């Protein structure tokens, strides 16, 4: 019995020795004894008040870097109560999974206030499907693809996201081709062709035309509307995950997101200063959705002088907004004059009424082009401000919303139609009369390229001609490498759909290289996420366009701007914007620039990010950034 007990004791001792040996090897491999000795020695000399807090901080620096362990997509509501996508990033930090950050991306869908019920219902279903597909992508393939990656490896993350998206594009292409082939197999025998319609009757004599006078002017037919650039359902998952990873990296490094984006922009070299983007604040809206006759001005936008800080600009525009509210609340004075103006409207004073729009500004009823501009002039005079000195104006014309395709003309004011050539004259006259207007956004449809050229050459030396809706998606711009169609000297870019952080860096570099200005814009249906402000600051864009100073989802972003400006002031890294400069190229300069571009195109280019060239083998026609 004693021998048996001694054998068990000997076996236990051998097992303990073996465990001790394994422990020694484990700690030695991880350099624990040396590091622990150094840490304890240094702690003794420092003698911190919180000894365990000090040890915890030191050990955390020795821990493995965080890696992505899970990405979760959720269906949430935006500022208008419509579905959109939220992405949560979970990382393994010191052996435990932790929720690091969340982002909400806005959808690309426009807000149609007066849309037909059937169209609104169809878009609602399309939006719901897009968000549902995005959630599915995030929670299945994307979370597995990025598992174990470091959030700091933004370029590689974006590379994998683009590969994934390219595969989805190919899947969608194959599905559509299959559906097409099935349709062809069931199509009945076509009917004989319908004869062409008879030629239109000669134009009737215009009112006021003298007898015997022949009207020899024949208007050129308008170019048909181009097909809307398709958006692959679910594509917002790519942009949302890319942003979420960038934000997670910033939070893990205890840095603001804008600084992380600035490092991406400057090849990981921290810039000495960062400038705040100039504000483009929507003050009033007089577009198609307003109750007045004026359609031309979807947004009348105020731009504070570049020398003003963001805080000073916001305070000034808040005072202007208060004055507009007072004017709307004032009772209507009795009409003493009933003569008619040039546009057929009564010249007597009309009470201005308004309602809050989804853009965060007041939609007011105006019957002439001058009315909202005179209103702003009056407010500036009351506040001791001078247009063209303290602030400038921009007009979002939303040309694509003004076209009446039955008449082939733009309906500038209800019942007043102008062809594309007449619109050029209208804008030139407007800028001549109101030189404080320094930017026109989407003055035409994108199809009216001839008029874009005309207005650029007529006004480009004193006014920014900016393409927003008229521009192509970021994906297409990067694919083609051409931002000059339509002719403009500025672009509005937005973070939507499959646009990654690497894409934003690349497109802003491209815009900068062409001496164009970049406007970072919000979408029509925004969420309360304020990340796009950090993107604008980090990318160093010229302007930021967030809508008006009302509605929580927009005010949140203005508050973030103020916070960032305060941080930069405290850090001594706030740079300042230069005066407005209009880079205008005449035809000779344009030809010289095109020759240089052609020469540069013959040289092999090294991609800045590995996301470039991923989709060369895939059809990108189903994409939109």
Swiss-Prot record:
The gene is ENO4. Residues 189-203 have a biased composition (Pro residues). Keywords: Glycolysis, Lyase. The active site is at residue 497. Its EC number is 4.2.1.11. May be required for sperm motility and function. It catalyses: (2R)-2-phosphoglycerate = phosphoenolpyruvate + H2O. It is an enzyme of class 4 (lyase). Interacts with ENO1 and AKAP4. GO terms for molecular function: magnesium ion binding; phosphopyruvate hydratase activity. Pathway: Carbohydrate degradation; glycolysis; pyruvate from D-glyceraldehyde 3-phosphate: step 4/5. One of its GO terms (biological process) is glycolytic process. PANTHER family: ENOLASE, ENOLASE 4. Residues 336-346 have a biased composition (Basic and acidic residues). This is Enolase 4. Synthesized as an approximately 70-kDa precursor, which then undergoes proteolytic cleavage to an approximately 60-kDa enzyme; HOATZ associates directly or indirectly with ENO4 to mediate this process before its transport to mature flagella. GO terms for cellular component: phosphopyruvate hydratase complex.
């Amino acid at each position: 019995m004693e021998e048996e007990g001694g054998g068990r004791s000997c076996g236990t001792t051998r097992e303990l020795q073996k465990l001790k040996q394994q422990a020694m090897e484990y700690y030695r491999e991880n350099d624990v004894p040396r590091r622990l000795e150094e840490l304890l020695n240094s702690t003794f000399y420092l003698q911190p008040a919180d000894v365990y807090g000090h040890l915890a901080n030191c050990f955390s620096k020795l821990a493995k870097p965080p890696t992505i362990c899970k990405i979760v997509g959720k269906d949430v509501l935006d500022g208008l109560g419509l579905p959109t996508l939220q992405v949560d990033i979970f990382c393994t930090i010191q052996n435990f999974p932790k929720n690091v950050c969340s982002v909400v991306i806005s959808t690309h869908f426009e807000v149609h206030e007066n849309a037909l019920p059937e169209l609104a219902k169809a878009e609602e279903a399309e939006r719901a499907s897009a968000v549902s597909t995005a959630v599915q992508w995030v929670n299945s393939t994307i979370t597995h693809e990025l598992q174990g990656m470091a959030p700091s490896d933004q370029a590689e993350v974006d590379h994998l996201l683009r590969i994934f998206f390219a595969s989805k594009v190919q899947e969608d292409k194959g599905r559509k081709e299959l559906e097409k082939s099935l349709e062809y197999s069931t199509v009945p025998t076509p009917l004989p062709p319908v004869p062409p319609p008879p030629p239109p009757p000669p134009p009737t004599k215009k009112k006021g035309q003298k007898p015997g006078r022949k009207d020899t002017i024949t208007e050129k037919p308008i170019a048909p509307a181009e097909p809307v650039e398709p958006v692959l359902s679910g594509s917002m998952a790519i942009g949302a995950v890319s942003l979420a990873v960038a934000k997670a990296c910033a939070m893990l490094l205890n840095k603001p997101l804008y600084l992380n984006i600035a490092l991406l922009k400057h090849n990981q070299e921290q810039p000495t200063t960062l400038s705040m983007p100039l504000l483009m604040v929507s003050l009033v809206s007089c577009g198609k959705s307003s109750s007045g006759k004026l359609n031309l001005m979807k947004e009348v936008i105020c731009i504070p002088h570049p020398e003003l800080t963001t805080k000073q600009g916001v305070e000034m525009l808040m005072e202007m907004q208060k004055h507009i509210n007072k004017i709307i609340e004032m009772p209507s004075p009795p009409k003493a004059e009933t003569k008619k103006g040039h546009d057929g409207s009564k010249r007597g004073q009309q009470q201005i009424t308004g309602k809050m729009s989804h853009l965060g500004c007041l939609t007011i009823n105006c019957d002439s082009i001058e009315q909202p501009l005179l209103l702003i002039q009056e407010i500036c005079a009351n506040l001791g401000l001078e247009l063209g000195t303290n602030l400038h104006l921009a007009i979002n014309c939303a040309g694509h919303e003004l076209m009446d395709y039955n008449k082939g003309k733009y309906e500038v004011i209800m019942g007043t139609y102008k062809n594309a050539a007449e619109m050029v004259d209208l804008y030139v006259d407007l800028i001549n009369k109101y030189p404080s207007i320094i930017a026109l956004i989407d003055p035409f449809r994108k199809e009216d390229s001839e008029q874009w050229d005309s207005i650029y050459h007529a006004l480009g030396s004193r006014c920014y001609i900016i393409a927003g809706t008229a521009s192509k998606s970021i994906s297409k711009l990067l694919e083609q490498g051409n931002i000059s169609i339509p002719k403009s000297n500025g672009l509005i870019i937005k973070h939507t759909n499959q646009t990654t952080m690497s894409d934003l860096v690349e497109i802003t570099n491209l815009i900068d290289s062409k001496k164009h200005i970049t406007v970072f814009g919000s979408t029509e249906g925004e969420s309360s996420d304020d990340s796009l402000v950090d993107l604008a600051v980090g990318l160093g864009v010229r302007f930021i366009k967030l809508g008006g100073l009302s509605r929580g989802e927009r005010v949140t972003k203005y508050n973030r701007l103020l916070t960032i400006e305060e941080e930069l002031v405290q850090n001594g890294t706030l740079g300042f914007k230069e005066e407005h400069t209009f880079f205008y190229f005449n035809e000779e300069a344009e030809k010289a620039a095109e020759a240089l571009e052609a020469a540069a195109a013959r040289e092999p280019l090294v991609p800045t990010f590995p996301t470039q060239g991923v989709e060369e083998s895939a059809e990108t026609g189903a994409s939109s950034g």
